[in-house]
């Protein structure tokens, strides 16, 4: 099939590349000419395992193209994906200005029947809005469908190529058939294509992400209670998650959720609920717990060292909001580091992939180390903020020698309290008093 994907951000770039990988001819459209030139030369602006290699191979095999000519790209395509950003507005709602701008341009470019796909995460009712905008610009037939993405950063390529389900919101049999044909090669293992009405598909993305956010906040709430009553949060987690009705995913205590999806989608769903006369108390509480969780971690540090940290330097391991990505949007590290800086602390930080991203957030306010062990030199404590694999089994003897005092604040519950305390460390984690 001939496809255009409008927007070369995280979602658009992964979707376009993976669709090309299955033999489709894909044009990725963006108005940033410098970015497009870099992509043509195999320079990828985001870190996502396997993506760079796949872009290079599909570009060289003439299946994947990058263009700033939206009109020509739409004219050549049967399916047009809208994958532009929907940034959070001041009131928590999703800002649809880019979606609406693209819809208007698509309408002007349509020359025959097209399937227009909302791939961006958008509020319920957006497809109707897009349809009305396009109708004003063209007399040609078209259908607008919703096809939300469920990609995990750090595993996005695998998630797209081997999805556990594909959700298609469509009110048109013609569009549904085309979308089923498009996704057939991705679902040879028998995982389902779930066909539903457009509004239900739009709601599904928000419902799924908000549920996962609630699970994370629930795990953190339980861990905080465990600390107060003297229970072991890890043992409680294991006992609870052994129940098949509950399962183990997204129930690990830590520093809360971050990234480009969960925080934004939770707030957007709350806004949608409130705007339609519904209370979203459970979801609102998850958001509050998430914000508080980072500050509780800072409180652990100040409880030990005192409120004045002007003579303290901390090593930070991990800046990205999760492993296997360089994304720092809504990362716990931002809140925690800024809070420590305000109290006078100095920071020496290291992350395997997010160092350049961190410079955008912190500039020269912190020191950037070249390795995890360099970050430890002459610091008063180690703060583990992201659970990268290379931090899971470090050389603790080396850590002890490099730190001025052998203290670890583990925000991801990666290490064994028993073994570290036996080795002479002072150890703080989440959910253990």
Where are these regions (language model features)?
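Structural/interface elements that position substrates and couple domains in central-metabolism enzymes
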Residues: 1-433
